[in-house]
Amino acid sequence: MIRVTVWNEGVHEAESREVAAVYPEGIHGQLKSFLGAQEDMEVRTATLREPDCGLPPEVLENTDVLIWWGHKAHDEVPDELVERVHDRVLRGMGFIALHSAHFSKPFKRLMGTSCALHWR
C-alpha cells in the first residue's frame, strides 16, 4: 500500500467562489478523490490552515509520497515544517511538486537553489 499525503494551501478555494465551485472539496480533495480510487493507495490530505499545516511529524513518518500543491502562500509555510519535509525526503519519502510548487519553500530547500524561473 502506498501512503500518499496531498498538501494544498487551500487559499484559492477560500478566496474565490469560482475556484470553490470547481473544487468544492478543495484541489487537495479532488486529487484525493482520483488517487484514492487506486487500489494500492491510501490517501490523506493536509492544508496550510490546519495545525502544523496538516503535517505533524507522525503524518510525515507515515507518508511514502507527499504531493505538494502551492501557488501564492509559499512564505506562510513555517521553516520548521520545511526542515521536517526535507529530512523526511532525505530518508526516502517521495516529493511531487505541482503547479507553482517549484517556488515553495520545501522544493527550494530540496533543490538548493532559488528555483526562480530564471535562477540559472
Could you tell me what each predicted segment is?
Residues 1-62:
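Aromatic-Pro/Gly-enriched surface loop or interdomain linker
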